[in-house]
A protein has these predicted regions:
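Acidic, Ser/Thr-rich peripheral helices and adjacent loops at domain boundaries
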Residues: 25-30, 112-127, 131
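Domain-scale segment recognizer with a strong primary affinity
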Residues: 5-8, 112-113, 127-255
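Active-site beta-loop-alpha junctions of metal-dependent nucleic acid enzymes
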Residues: 71-95, 119
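Flexible loop/turn segments at secondary-structure boundaries
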Residues: 7, 45-48, 68-69, 78-81, ...
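Secondary-structure transition/capping motifs at alpha-helix termini
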Residues: 49-53, 64-65, 89-97, 128-135
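Acidic/histidine-rich, metal-coordinating catalytic segments
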Residues: 91-114
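Amphipathic alpha-helical
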Residues: 1-38, 251-255
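An active-site-proximal beta-strand-loop segment
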Residues: 27-70, 75-77
């Protein structure tokens, strides 16, 4: 009788556990950084260029293997801005094998644009070569909110802190150039996080340096130091824009 009683089932039933599948191959195989990349857009952020207040968006690209991130600023949410930002990312980080994203309109249209351009080529050999070498797009299932955690988790790391920081600062004195620099500073901070914890025993005479995504991207074991000086809240209203950015960067790091 208990299994047919709805009230008893709620009171005595065991909670349903989340069934997790194995990690995909792109998360476990050693490959060059950003060979498999997840992409998403976050924002918006209000900036003031000259006397005009505008909205800007952040484009996040994360490596599925090294968990490194790369940020770009989008002036709009249309396909043209996305393609230009994607091409600039590829010029910096190198070619991407697979690009994972949700079913955003700008992502889908960009995939169709690239495929249409290859089909319009007149030379068969060039068309065949590009069709095998170009980046392939992989979209998550529509209305599947449980998918895309690879990039959604990285967006949460940045968006929640950055949005709260800009609101608490109560300032709209940041222009697009300053926002770009701030996102790059945040990118460096996020990529400096260690993969695992490290322990330092008493018999060790050296400092144990943890492995970070920045080590894999730059092949250097030294972190970028901030510029010398003390940055305080009055710097938000300074005419020196670089001091505004450095103050916000220090606040982001402390949170």
């Amino acid at each position: 009788m208990i299994r047919h009683c709805a009230k008893c089932t709620k009171l005595r039933g065991n909670p349903v556990g989340q069934k997790m599948s194995n990690l995909p191959q792109c998360r476990t195989e050693p490959e060059a950084p950003f060979t498999h990349t997840g992409v998403d857009v976050f924002g918006s952020f209000k900036v003031k260029d000259y006397r005009k207040e505008c909205k800007r968006y952040g484009l996040l690209l994360t490596c599925t293997a090294s968990r490194a991130v790369h940020f770009k600023v989008l002036e709009d949410m249309n396909t043209d801005c996305y393609i230009n930002s994607l091409r600039s990312f590829l010029a910096i980080r190198g070619p991407v094998s697979v690009l994972y994203s949700d079913n955003g309109t700008n992502f889908v249209v960009a995939s169709n644009e690239f495929g249409k351009t290859v089909k319009e080529l007149s030379e068969p050999r060039i068309k065949e070569y590009l069709s095998t070498k170009q980046c392939s797009f992989s979209f998550s299932t529509p209305t599947a909110s449980h998918m895309g955690g690879t990039w959604e988790r990285m967006i949460r790391t940045v968006r929640n802190v950055l949005r709260g920081l800009l609101i608490e600062s109560n300032t709209n004195r940041i222009d697009t150039s300053s926002l770009c620099t701030l996102l790059y500073e945040c990118m460096h901070i996020v990529n400096s996080r260690p993969f695992t914890t490290t322990t330092l025993h008493s018999d060790q005479n050296f400092e144990s340096i943890p492995l970070t995504p920045n080590n894999l991207l730059t092949m250097k074991n030294k972190n970028l130091l901030p510029p010398p000086g003390s940055f305080t809240s009055p710097d938000l209203y300074s005419h020196k824009r670089w001091r505004r950015v450095q103050y916000l960067t220090e606040q982001f790091w402390s949170r």
